[in-house]
């Protein structure tokens, strides 16, 4: 008996849906808590930049812990694809940029779009960097602790 491809397995689809529900709720909560700034869609900008950073952290941390299988795959699907996919909202970014342009704020629309897209790349890169640094530090501590334990034998 052959198994369906990973993206068609009901358990994986349910992980993404469950994560997506919580990501949507988190986005809604932050959108409600963060005010717009003189008509500027600050909530979406903050959410997308935070999501890009956190996705970079998550994927780098998972990658450094091993192959994409078992618990790591479950976390990636539920948190990375589901939660972060629903939490970030580039369709809203596009809609808000068009709305800014339509309300005679063309410069603001361009700045918003560029800041969001370039900022997203920089935020995800910063997340990857932060997770990488954390991994190196914790690995060095573990290695040092093992060496100290062996020296005390």
Labelled PLM ranges:
Residues 1-153:
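Membrane-interface helix-loop junctions in multi-pass transporters/channels
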